[in-house]
């Protein structure tokens, strides 16, 4: 938000202000094209913003390195470079907006008001409207309704379960009813998992669609791209979510393999209780552990590639429109 505001401050009077001071006509009296002059103003604003941000990043990086919170590496350097590149994109977007307001306004006072209106709409209103957009345009089922469906699925399974499916005798693991109980518990677990996983997927789609709408703002695009650059945020969450589902299968496979080796177990897998599976302890070091794997550059870039293209298109479209207007601009 601050970067976007600073970029607008550097450009809102770049044309209208110079027109008022009569320096714009003087500049164009030299052998320099309007496109070159406009692009020079645009580029100087972006570089100025990047210089300010780079100084802050450098100070923060030095503090982190001195305190030992991180060590310098190629990966860290790449993340810093990616962050600065994304910052340059959002600065370019709002610099283009600032030049646009400066070209269409008759004087610098009006261009300032127009630039502030653009900043409030694209920098504040749209990014903070995500909750309204999600609830209004992409509503999903409430958690209470999901729980009711889970309870209904449990009731249906219980009604159709064979007699004895709830019998249990912890002293006799080979009790025949334990197999029925294990089958029922497995079905209950799978039914709940299917319902909740489907609900979570609708939540993911709601979030993604809402973010697509709020991506009309370069500030939202900046957030999405910086998350990808740092390997954090929603991109990281989805990767961990998918990896945890893989780990679930690995852990279950480990337990079943452990159970098969126990001759005192009837091998009736019960996900809730150990009445019909092995009760022998397992060595801690043999249990599969979940470890978060670092995201590769491709894994970070792939989910946000469209966002990156949209941001670049944003900058080009606004600047091109500004250029067309500036070519016809009366500098007198």
Regions found by a protein language model. Give the residues of each.
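Transmembrane alpha-helical segments and their membrane-interface loop/helix boundaries
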Residues: 1, 109-332
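Long, hydrophobic alpha-helical segments
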Residues: 1-17, 21
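Hydrophobic/aromatic residues in alpha-helical transmembrane segments
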Residues: 7-11, 96-97, 113, 322
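Alpha-helix N-cap/helix-start motif at helix boundaries, enriched for small hydrophobics
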Residues: 35-41, 326
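Short helix-to-coil transition segments within interhelical loops
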Residues: 26-34
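Alpha-helical transmembrane segments of multi-pass membrane transport proteins
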Residues: 4, 17, 51-52, 89-90, ...
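Secretory targeting signals
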Residues: 40-103, 143-169, 293
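Short alpha-helical transmembrane interface motifs in multi-pass membrane proteins
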Residues: 5-9, 48, 78-83, 303-307
